[in-house]
UniProtKB/Swiss-Prot annotation:
HAMAP family: FolE. The gene is folE. It comes from Escherichia coli (strain K12). NCBIfam families: folE, PRK09347.1-1, PRK09347.1-3. Toroid-shaped homodecamer, composed of two pentamers of five dimers. This is GTP cyclohydrolase 1.
């Protein structure tokens, strides 16, 4: 893995140790993003031709390149820890020891089984120990892990482990409520169902009062 920020390396190592890292094979060789996009575009051209689409049409001719750019630079950019957000931690000088909650964090991810959209919102809470984190960094961590092929259960746990690792405390909780387009747009084609996943650590798991306070915040969000 190329040189990473200390925070990115710590989070990656923590996820690997817990068996929660996204399934990735070791690269056969290092590849720059432009080469990667060119190869993906070539394979996408073959797929579209197998579907009998006419890539000479001006509406379709750039589609393989658009998809390749979207995969590498956007919706799968979270596969590259070089894109892990810069983290700002602040000493907890005020000795904050109550729950900090961020609600309605929008996320868009991709189902790793069918490569279609997962669209949802996250609620994240933590009880500070020695440090507090810049609030926007929580949103960025959620979005980083969402920008991968995902299953919602793993996504929820990855966000939890990342924040526990960075904040030096187990007292973190994450809940995600999302619509899966592999359910909405294909198969059963259920347009109204949603999936909720929750991952609790520390006091959020062991203390009934703390857990209920978090779940009340989640219900308020819904």
């Amino acid at each position: 893995m190329p040189s990473l920020s200390k925070e990115a390396a710590l989070v990656h190592e923590a996820l690997v140790a817990r068996g929660l890292e996204t399934p990735l094979r070791p690269p056969v060789h290092e590849m720059d993003n432009e080469t990667r996009k060119s190869l993906i575009a070539g394979h996408m051209t073959e797929i579209m031709q197998l579907l009998n689409l006419d890539l000479a049409d001006d509406s379709l001719m750039e589609t393989p390149h658009r998809i390749a750019k979207m995969y590498v630079d956007e919706i799968f950019s979270g596969l590259d820890y070089a894109n892990f957000p810069k983290i700002t931690l602040i000493e907890n000088k005020m000795k904050v020891d109550e729950m900090v909650t961020v609600r309605d964090i929008t996320l868009t991810s991709t189902c790793e089984h069918h490569f279609v959209t997962i669209d949802g919102k996250a609620t994240v809470a933590y009880i500070p120990k020695d440090s507090v984190i810049g609030l926007s960094k929580i949103n960025r961590i959620v979005q980083f892990f969402a920008q991968r092929p995902q299953v919602q259960e793993r996504l929820t746990q990855q966000i939890l482990i990342a924040l526990q690792t960075l904040l030096g405390t187990n007292n973190v909780a994450v809940s995600i409520d999302a619509v899966h387009y592999c359910v909405k747009a294909r198969g059963i084609r259920d347009a109204t169902s949603a999936t909720t996943t929750t991952s609790l650590g520390g006091l959020f798991k062991s203390s009934q009062n703390t857990r209920h306070e978090f779940l009340r915040a989640v219900r308020h969000h819904n």
